[in-house]
Amino acid sequence: MVLLTAIPQGFLDDLPEEDQQAIREILGKRVLLNEYDDAGRAELEFRDHEGTLHYLYVAPEFIITAY
């Protein structure tokens, strides 16, 4: 489990409002780190308040280990 510590600048710009809100809601909360992709980005998995499953890819500097 990791914490998303910040949202990369411009990351939300082209996303639907409901996806933007879901990502804002997990900021600073524990989410599942699935793996790192070939580009070195962390694949995060989480469910929003409605139970919708989301995946997002961020550079490692935007996450920390959750204890």
Residue ranges and their predicted role:
Residues 1-67:
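Basic/aromatic-rich interaction segments and small domains that mediate binding to polyanionic partners
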